[in-house]
């Protein structure tokens, strides 16, 4: 029986992730890593498949950069972004079956438009006196890794996949020559962050 890291869907998910990356980075600068990855995709895919089978895959360090608005953002290498997208696609079926139907960020749930439509329907059927929108400041920056891994295990995610997610969470972030391993938080600059069930610290 194939393991969670060598099951047939992985090949299709890597191809889907490759198509996504090519589209998302279609206007990237000539020096962006996506162009080297596109040029050597067959070799990269074979290497990723082998590293998955051998459980030797590791993420590169993540660059912390400042955006035009002054915010700090983590920038992943092209290959790591592709792999995280493939991992997200691989996890979606398991998480979609077990997470609340109100989690509209999951694939097939309608996203922001679906959430807005649900609120409109609710207001139409039973008009409330007030509607409030809230957000917890620093919530994602304070996600506890051990709590997240425990929730993923309870949801039935295979241990080898949780190990990969742990490498993603405990990423090595670099800025101005300094390196720091992340002890908490998830990276919101990756395609994987929005697919996870977020437990509080």
Specify the residue positions occupied by each region the protein language model found.
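Conserved polymerase palm-domain catalytic core
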Residues: 51, 122-201
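Short, compositionally biased low-complexity segments
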Residues: 11-27, 58-62, 89-94, 172
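Conserved pre-motif C helix in the palm subdomain of viral-like polymerases
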Residues: 70-100, 182-201
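Non-catalytic, polymerase-adjacent accessory regions of viral genome-replication enzymes
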Residues: 1-54
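Active-site-proximal segment of RNA-dependent polymerases
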Residues: 4, 88-145
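Heme-based O2/NO sensor domains and their adjacent alpha-helical segments
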Residues: 44-61, 67, 71-75
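Non-catalytic, well-ordered alpha-helical scaffold segments
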Residues: 15, 42, 46, 80-89, ...
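Glycine-/proline-rich flexible loop or hinge segments
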Residues: 23-35, 64-74, 98-102
């Amino acid at each position: 029986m194939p393991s969670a890291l060598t099951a047939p869907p992985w090949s299709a998910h890597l191809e889907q992730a490759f198509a996504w990356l090519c589209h998302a980075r279609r206007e990237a600068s000539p020096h962006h890593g996506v162009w080297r990855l596109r040029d050597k995709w067959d070799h990269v895919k074979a290497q990723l498949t082998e590293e998955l089978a051998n459980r030797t895959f590791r993420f590169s360090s993540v660059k912390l950069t400042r955006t035009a608005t002054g915010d700090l953002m983590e920038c992943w290498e092209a290959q790591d972004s592709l792999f995280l997208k493939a991992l997200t696609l691989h996890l979606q079926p398991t998480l979609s079956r077990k997470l609340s139907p109100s989690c509209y960020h999951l694939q097939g749930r309608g996203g922001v438009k679906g959430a807005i439509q649900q609120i409109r329907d609710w207001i139409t059927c039973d008009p409330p006196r007030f509607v409030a929108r809230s957000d917890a400041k620093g919530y994602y920056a304070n996600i506890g890794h051990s709590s997240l891994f425990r929730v993923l295990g309870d949801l039935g995610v295979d241990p080898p996949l949780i190990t990969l997610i742990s490498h993603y969470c405990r990423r090595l972030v670099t800025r101005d020559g300094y390196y720091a391993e992340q002890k908490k938080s998830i990276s919101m600059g990756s395609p994987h962050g929005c697919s996870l069930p977020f437990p509080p610290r």
